[in-house]
């Protein structure tokens, strides 16, 4: 039996590890044409036990769209289908610097999205992995531990996207346009928000704030499942130095809610009315910080002739503005799983690792480009698209469903000529663009 190590127990690492340890019915085999001939001997390395994860703070917002959820279902891993709210629409509105109402739209999702608190998912998946006979080594793993782990396994996959472990993979400057964080982030899981007009069920909505030349940031609200049931999540994407950049002292959940309401009262009074009754779900409900989007070289040599392969955030880290972190993690894990199954008994050498990542990158590069575009002031053609979406339901529908697979945005959203050709084809050409950039 071939031995595989997975270092990191997040969305990507556990999806891969569980796929390599299918249950006795075979229900959790990999999607795609290649099925596992037999389970692998898999060890997951992670710092925290399931109970410690559940007792800790939230980790992300993790809205997963239909295509990524389908990968979990195919692997028998979507355990919260009936419990998690089904997000059926993406709402988009605009607030200008004078705080006057702006244009907006709601695009229905063809396949509902869902968000499951990663504390719930990680803890449940760790327990499921051990129940299937997988081994978990609990404790901190650093770069100095990788040579020993790699020597003891046929393949070592590093799926930890933060801290020293991620740094073993060299930054790829060709695909990493940013050298510092573009947003300061604040997340809080809450209850007590109200539905806006036009959205009568669970959804995700976003309001960018700022003019055509300068953004202040974005405010998100989405429905989710947390430790004790359904909830809402609020997220600030604050441009550094702007009016929403008030999180450097890393406040707790109560203070995040208090500051959020102060910001909403002054900048988004409509959202303030919807959120004024919210309260944190628990003592670990808040997360603040910042990250720099980056693409890293996928293979690292940790000892002479010993290589490890990066997965998920370890090698392609997106800002959460595009909502693609967990979606990309699931897609990457499923791709690696198929590649491992197809490789049979051949060695997992550097050539195989590079080839495996290169095939994944053919899709991931589009996701990275999309998320990076969202971090800057919207180009003129994007402003035309969003303005048209407020008046043409077909445009709103296509935009909303594009988040399920952002590679499709390359066909229209990412290119001015293609965008204008699409708008003309659906009768939305010439849509007025508000002076405030909405």
PLM regions: where:
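N-terminal FAD cofactor-binding segment of flavoenzymes
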Residues: 48-95
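Central beta-strand plus flanking loop segment that forms part of the substrate or channel wall
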Residues: 169-210
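Conserved FAD/dinucleotide-binding core of flavoprotein oxidoreductases
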Residues: 211-286
